[in-house]
Swiss-Prot record:
Gene3D superfamilies: Tetratricopeptide repeat domain (1.25.40.10)
Originating gene: CCM1
Record GO cellular component, one term: mitochondrion
Protein family membership: Belongs to the CCM1 family.
Classification of source organism: Eukaryota, Fungi, Dikarya, Ascomycota, Saccharomycotina
Protein name, per record: Mitochondrial 15S rRNA processing factor CCM1
Organism expressing this protein natively: Kluyveromyces lactis (strain ATCC 8585 / CBS 2359 / DSM 70799 / NBRC 1267 / NRRL Y-1140 / WM37) (Yeast)
Length: 853
């Protein structure tokens, strides 16, 4: 070691005597001994119990030892912290007698050192669990001290605000609301910066309580409030999510109250209402689908506050008009936006909304105009633009009326848009980023294949879609349940079966024609897409994702269905499969508690009147429907599509079976329930004779322990998977009678609809709906008699319904041509006089004009 002399220099003697030495590094062959360092275990890993396999004894024992070690360390740390606190208190007492200047110096040094320590630790350093538990100011760091002082339950603050990713301020607001001081004395600026700006995701109740406390803090003097506070309150109320229509209307009512209170504030203070306030109000009115509130807010801000809505406001209004099906107003507002100013010029979002309006109207011409206009004005097209345009053209190709005879051309152009999405890297990226876009694309492709009658492509799409959904929901179930828990396949299938996609598949079955060539096979790119999709599906289930489930989609193991009978059978199997939650129930089985005649007797004994009996029966039916039948699939829209399949494939027996099994007459149900109640009260129960509604196979399925249930019980049980007939069902039945030339079916339908017109279900319709329904059914009756060459009967229907039906020539065109073909000029003339007759108002106007005044 070298020493320094008096002047700080090295001693020369030592330098001369020092020997030079060379340090040789160790050879690489020599292995150094590794240090034995204790592994540091993260607190999160210690407390994580979800990853433990409780069936593994060693793993469980290891976790127990780990938790014991963690508890011991935590106890020592608490003891050490308490000792430090005690020493700190003693030092503070000693420093009270020390010179104040020295105390200030120590305090400043402490501040500097603490700031240096903070810099060393870094801003991202996380506190462990023990530090948070030992901190005396944990609640004050989560909540301002002036608020935490008013909340007695300190544990509540930690429970609600400890997890920063999932904070719940609703209990905090409730606790403040029930406290003694509430928000008194805090000041508006503190309330805005520390409460309104920080407390998010509040419920309607919490926001109402907060609003009440704010008004209380200012002595109910609204003039002490400011624009920022009103804006934040309105935005918070508009973000409230309420599943009920009444809840949404309550939000609008609260916003209206705030605007009226703001009027009082504006009379004493000068601030300008903002666009955010307007958008919050009209957004809430749009969610509530309320014309009254929408009209009030628009007039309030434009007239009272002299504010011009911006493009975002107008976009919300257009969306509201679209939801309310007032498409004419949406088009008028869209056209006016083009001429207001450059700031109001429609952007991509507005154009996409108008393409959705084109979908609703099935107006392909306007869709093409909108698409071309975007090119002319250099408006950016995004993925949604192409999807909306493609779907609009697909829906417009539904029939020759909406497509104007250009159905195939519209489908071809729609497929071109879909190919554009796949070919464009930017659009493909948008497609993969948002799962919702994938759904829209798949839905558009299903619409195209359904209207085109491309059963092969539609089957492949439906199979892949349902299989993918089942897989996702299956693994989601496994993620949140143990391996020993039984898999709830009913719940999984209920989530996986889509009513909309199933309806499009049924529509493709109904459009099936063996001789028809799908549009996709008309050009190379389409053929390649169709071939790759169809051959990527294995209907035998070898590549399915159903795991341990023995149930899979009942689809024939064929890439193409080339026969109408196969189509009928597969549609019937899929229909039952969807209704039975993936085959986990049998809709023909007797429910629990209703196996014998005695079960009905017990219900009758409990009911004093026939109305009580009907009520109890209705409650039982509601329970059965919710438990045993998937009524997400069994709706009127899907049922009509299901009934249309045998009509278009010309299978009259199949249609009658489907109609009988899945529909019932409401008036007939009431009659049978009343009749059964009277017979049961007189102890004259029906003999166990099978109903005509059930064949031998059905009755065998319903036999319980060798006892055949009564006819009424069978009828009652079948109600759980039946829908009451309405105007649409009677119209479908008449179309079937026309297609099958079935006189008996036509007369039965006519008679039953006459009884239906006397029921409450028909009388509850609006006068316009009743008149439209009568006109449609009368037109179908005329068409039936015309096809059967019963021309006088057809003419009689027209003449007898002059008061209720406004007959147009397009409605009787086939009858007029038939009358001319048989040279019945008198009947043809009478028919023309009916369709050419003028209303009384028009006749009166013409008479006034003809007067020579």
């Amino acid at each position: 070691m070298l020493s320094l002399g008096k002047n700080g220099k090295t001693s020369s003697t030592l330098v001369r005597n020092a020997r030079r030495s060379v340090i040789m590094p160790a050879s690489r062959d020599v292995r150094s001994r590794k240090r034995r360092a204790r592994s540091v275990t993260d607190t999160k890993d210690v407390l994580d119990l979800d990853s433990i396999d409780f069936t593994n004894e060693k793993e469980v024992q290891f976790k127990v030892n780990q938790l014991k070690e963690f508890t011991r360390n935590l106890r020592e740390q608490i003891k050490y912290t308490d000792e430090l606190k005690r020493k700190h208190v003693i030092e503070e007492e000693e420093t009270k007698s020390v010179d104040p200047e020295m105390h200030d110096f120590d305090s400043d040094a402490g501040v500097i050192l603490s700031s240096l320590n903070d810099k060393v630790a870094g801003p991202g350093a996380e506190q462990n669990l023990s530090t948070l538990l030992l901190s005396d100011k944990a609640d004050t760091s989560l909540l301002p001290e002036r608020l935490s002082e008013r909340i007695k339950d300190k544990d509540l603050i930690l429970r609600c605000l400890f997890d920063k990713r999932n904070r719940d301020f609703n209990p905090i607001v409730t606790e403040l609301y029930h406290s003694e001081q509430r928000l008194k004395g805090l000041g508006i600026q503190f309330i805005y910066s520390k409460i309104l700006s920080k407390f998010d995701k509040l419920s309607f109740t919490s926001l109402s309580q907060l609003d009440e406390m704010i008004m209380e803090s200012v002595g109910n003097d609204s003039s002490r409030l400011n624009g920022n506070l009103y804006e934040h309150l309105m935005l918070s109320f508009s973000r409230v999510t309420s599943p009920s229509a009444q809840g949404k209307l309550e939000v609008c009512g609260k916003l209206r109250e705030l605007t009226e209170r703001m009027d009082a504030t504006l009379s004493k203070k000068s601030f300008q209402p903002t666009q955010y306030m307007l958008n919050a109000c009209i957004f809430a009115a749009s969610k509530a689908m309320s014309w009254e509130y929408m009209d009030f807010f628009l007039k309030k801000f434009t007239s009272t506050y002299d504010m011009q809505p911006n493009r975002k406001n107008y976009t919300t209004v257009i969306s509201f008009y679209t939801k309310m099906e007032h498409y004419k107003k949406a088009w008028q507002l869209f056209d006016s936006l083009k001429f207001l100013s450059l700031e109001h010029k429609p952007d991509t979002k507005v154009y996409n909304l108008m393409l959705e309006v084109c979908q609703k109207e099935k107006n392909y011409a306007r869709s093409l105009d909108i698409f071309q206009e975007m090119d002319d004005l250099n408006v950016t097209k995004d993925l949604k633009t192409y999807l909306n345009a493609a779907k609009s053209l697909a829906l417009s190709s539904a029939d020759n009326v909406t497509s104007e005879g250009k159905a195939d051309s519209l489908r071809l152009m729609s497929w071109k848009y879909i190919h554009k999405i796949h070919d464009d890297p930017k659009l493909s990226k948008q497609l993969t980023e948002n799962p919702r876009n994938n759904m829209l694309l798949l839905e558009t492709m299903m619409v195209l294949s359904a209207y085109d009658g491309d059963v092969g492509f539609a089957r492949a799409l439906y199979y892949k879609y349902t299989n993918a959904l089942f897989k996702a929901h299956f693994y989601e179930f496994k993620k949140y349940h143990k391996d020993t828990d039984p898999v709830d396949y009913i719940r999984i299938w209920k989530k996986s079966l889509s009513a909309q996609m199933f309806n499009w598949l049924m529509l493709s079955y109904s459009k099936f024609k063996k001789s028809r060539l799908p549009v996709l096979l008309g050009y190379p790119e389409g053929s390649s897409l169709r071939r790759s999709m169809i051959y990527s599906v294995d209907y035998s289930g070898r590549d399915s994702s159903y795991e341990n489930s023995n149930i899979q989609l009942p689809m024939l193991p064929m890439t193409e269905l080339n026969d109408a009978e196969l189509t009928i059978n597969e549609s019937k199997a899929l229909w039952r499969f969807n209704l039975e939650f993936g085959g986990n129930y049998d809709i023909r089985e007797l429910p629990e508690g209703m196996q014998t005649v005695k079960d009905i007797e017990n219900i009758v004994k409990c009911a004093k009147t026939v109305n009580e009996f009907k009520l109890q029966i209705s409650q039982r039916l509601l329970e059965w429907k919710n438990r045993y039948v998937n009524h997400k699939i069994l709706n009127m829209k899907s049922l009509i599509t299901f009934l249309t399949i045998p009509i278009r494939l010309h299978e009259p027996n199949e249609f009658k079976l489907r109609l009988q099994e899945f529909t019932f007459q409401a008036f007939e149900f009431n009659e049978r329930v009343e009749y059964q109640f009277k017979k049961s009260k007189t102890n004259e129960l029906e003999s166990p004779v099978l109903s005509k509604d059930f064949n031998t196979t059905d009755s065998n399925a319903l036999v319980d322990n060798g006892i055949i249930p009564s006819e009424f019980l069978l009828y009652l049980v079948s109600m759980k998977h039946k829908l009451a007939t309405n105007c649409a069902i009677y119209e479908v039945s008449m179309k079937a009678a026309i297609a099958f030339h079935d006189y008996e079916l036509a007369m039965t339908t006519w008679k039953n609809r006459g009884k239906f017109r006397m029921t409450d279900a028909f009388q509850k319709l609006t006068p316009g709906e009743r008149q439209q329904s009568d006109a449609t059914f009368a037109q179908l009756m005329v068409e039936y008699f015309t096809n059967e060459k019963m021309y006088q009967d057809a003419l009689s229907i027209i003449l007898s319904s002059l008061k209720t039906v406004n007959w147009q020539y397009s409605m009787v065109k086939s009858l007029h041509r038939a009358l001319l073909a048989i040279e019945d000029e008198n009947s043809a003339a009478r028919l023309l006089s009916v369709v050419n007759r003028k209303s009384k108002i028009v006749e009166l106007e013409e008479e006034i004009k003809s007067l020579d005044l």
